[in-house]
Amino acid sequence: MTVVIGLTGGIASGKSTVSQMFRELSIPVIDADIIAREVVEKGKPAYNKIVEVFGTEVLQEDGELDRPKLGSVVFYNEEKRLQLNKIVHPAVREEMNRRKEMYIKEGMQAVVLDIPLLFESKLTSLVDRVLVVAVKPHTQLERLMKRNNFSEEEATARIQSQMPLEEKVKNADEVINNDGTIMGTKTQLQAILKKWNIID
């Protein structure tokens, strides 16, 4: 029986570190962000639909999607943002499901769906267990400022635009506290996977 794990966290909580640890344990990871880029590649159904709805002005000269341009179109327009999500989200969900089923057919012990907005996009039904990577608020703020070269105001605004991390923690099956060392994080992950009978 394959255990489907939903991996999520807050911005700059260190989710990609944990994602990499799963890969090192030979547990396949399906990354929602990568799939979201793939489903809008030139010629794909979602791409065609975007061009139909938003016009060719959201394309680069080579015909590929101009993501920053599309981003600025939907950023200030709630209706257009919802239109875009209506096109992209189902395509991402379908592709994630397809890959998940493939790993289940292969008899994998576990498969990870790495979804930053797992709760916000109401995708918890796709997974059996939810694992949240959490950090203390000041750690999150410091990491985000350092990683993205943000001012404190910018970083705070970005953090506040997401569901609060403590709310995600409340809804998790297990939580990894990622404030300490890489080794400490790895130890926590291994303990959780043992508890779930995924590794010995």
Swiss-Prot record:
<dbReference type="InterPro" id="IPR001977">
    <property type="entry name" value="Depp_CoAkinase"/>
</dbReference>
<protein>
    <recommendedName>
        <fullName>Dephospho-CoA kinase</fullName>
        <ecNumber>2.7.1.24</ecNumber>
    </recommendedName>
</protein>
<comment type="pathway">
    <text>Cofactor biosynthesis; coenzyme A biosynthesis; CoA from (R)-pantothenate: step 5/5.</text>
</comment>
<dbReference type="InterPro" id="IPR027417">
    <property type="entry name" value="P-loop_NTPase"/>
</dbReference>
<comment type="similarity">
    <text>Belongs to the CoaE family.</text>
</comment>
<feature type="domain" description="DPCK">
    <location>
        <begin position="4"/>
        <end position="200"/>
    </location>
</feature>
<dbReference type="GO" id="GO:0005737">
    <property type="term" value="C:cytoplasm"/>
</dbReference>
<keyword id="KW-0963">Cytoplasm</keyword>
<dbReference type="GO" id="GO:0015937">
    <property type="term" value="P:coenzyme A biosynthetic process"/>
</dbReference>
<dbReference type="GO" id="GO:0005524">
    <property type="term" value="F:ATP binding"/>
</dbReference>
<keyword id="KW-0547">Nucleotide-binding</keyword>
<keyword id="KW-0173">Coenzyme A biosynthesis</keyword>
<dbReference type="Pfam" id="PF01121">
    <property type="entry name" value="CoaE"/>
</dbReference>
<keyword id="KW-0067">ATP-binding</keyword>
<comment type="function">
    <text>Catalyzes the phosphorylation of the 3'-hydroxyl group of dephosphocoenzyme A to form coenzyme A.</text>
</comment>
<dbReference type="GO" id="GO:0004140">
    <property type="term" value="F:dephospho-CoA kinase activity"/>
</dbReference>
<keyword id="KW-0418">Kinase</keyword>
<feature type="binding site">
    <location>
        <begin position="12"/>
        <end position="17"/>
    </location>
    <ligand>
        <name>ATP</name>
    </ligand>
</feature>
<keyword id="KW-0808">Transferase</keyword>
